[in-house]
């Protein structure tokens, strides 16, 4: 078979076949939200990776937040979209939409932070908060809430916080962080969804005390001097899955070659993004444009260039804040998808027992990814099932281990949980086991998004 080599950045090449089947549909619309982790879609467009696959793609900025994205994918207005990892799972279950959607690939690891305003931080500092300590726990927030309850009694007014969508990583991360210190999010707080770009304005207006969101909307408030980022989602769960590329299952079935062409282009973009920090700087220039994220380059640079801004004036080294390809970040692990299902149960979003393995194997497509990966020379992990919390670069804040074979126990082992389904009923629906295999930490594509240059293997 004839081959062509596409140069994607500083010593990295992608090998793609010139004899691949032609896409059935070439004119496409892909929706995205104005966040730095839309970068793979932007780069696939701007660097010509879509075009090289014979695709004419309109990368469309969605103004209606994640609900708008979901509705337009379900209706068919968007052929594919930037999506929260939990969204295709929820839609397939009939939560926040009702359609069989599929997660074709993971767009990135990490990328979020929990940012609080100056007023709530001042109250937390009275109870021992040291916002320069890493990672920051929610212990001081718990003490403040307890004192506030004691003072207000029956008139207790819950604190208001923001996240981007009920089935978002952000919602689960904010709850995970709070509950690890004994806070009961649904009793002690009110957690509301807001479109990501509106988080800073809602905090400044006093509508919320803080929020969990992706970049650049944490750095934006820190640079304004209106708050501080207390913890990143990397601090909560090292190298956690964040966004996916989603599509309707019937679209994937009807247009398999189009789907694979889009996947190839996006994976090439992900590899390009991690190939060098120079590539990241070029990407910042594209993301800053008004038709994409529309944020100043100096704001975007705070997280995309190997640093993160927790507190104004202090850039902290954080090379893994955004990971797009390294450490198998593009691969849609079944075990990652199932973790989101456990959180849906934990927080009372699913009211009936479901076979979690069957569900995830219906939504996540590592099988299709493996086929495409060979065509672009993307390295595959040994299995779609793995444990998290056991290796150096996938630990949880509270030391817990996520083992998909113990998924039911995992849900009910949390001291704070609001499951609507009994452990016994859920266990009956999940009488299965999987073989897990741990991938070694490795950076196949370059230094960007890599813990240390010693892990780079090309």
Role assignments for model-derived ranges:
Residues 2-11:
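Sec-dependent signal peptide recognition
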Residues 12-21:
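Hydrophobic h-region of N-terminal signal peptides that target proteins for export
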Residues 22-186, 190-193, 205-219, 226-239, ...:
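Short, glycine-/small- and polar/acidic-enriched structural segments
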Residues 114-115, 244-247, 251-252:
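Short glycine- and hydrophobic/aromatic-rich loop-to-beta-strand nucleating segment
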Residues 338-458:
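Conserved C-terminal helix/tail region of periplasmic/extracytoplasmic solute-binding proteins
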